[in-house]
Amino acid sequence: LYQARYVAGEWSGDLWAYDTEDTVTPIWKATDVMPAPNSRNLMYGADSGAAKAFTWSNLSAAEKTLLGDTSTVLDYLRGDTTLEKRNPGGIYRNRGKILGDLVNSSPELVEAPYDLSYHRYNWTGASSYRSFIEGAAKTRTPMLYVGGNDGMLHGFNANTGVEVMGYIPKAVMAPLPSDTVSVLKKALAIE
């Protein structure tokens, strides 16, 4: 059982997993096992149309301008808390957790595919279906995908809760810097 969570006053979120026999104590909480900011596998929809690693060096001049021409905004969005207002010299909004609020997005579990006997049909690709489900797809890691108002579609290992990836669509790049300022200017991004 998976539950998306959020704290409205601070606009932070979490993803919890429960055993169906014990719905009181979580098996894991995603924010307890989040990778360090610079270790997160974050991608974004670049101006070029390709997905690129969400790093300052990968941004075009126009994309850097969207983020205010400072790498500290990107660092904040990756989860760096150094420049949050609670710290000396901090200028960005405090967050309870680095995972954005998961309000109207339900976690979607993606596991190994079921054999739906598509191989018996004659449309393109049908004959290779059995090879697909009996190959690498059979042992793929179960993943949970959920959209957050931190502007990312997150992918978590469903067994451990560790974030495996995050994707920021190009369409939400422009409002992201407003998330650093105040909860009153918080953009509702990926729901």
Task: Tell me the role of every PLM-derived stretch.
Residues 1-191:
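A fold-level detector for beta-propeller and closely related beta-sheet-rich head/sensor domains
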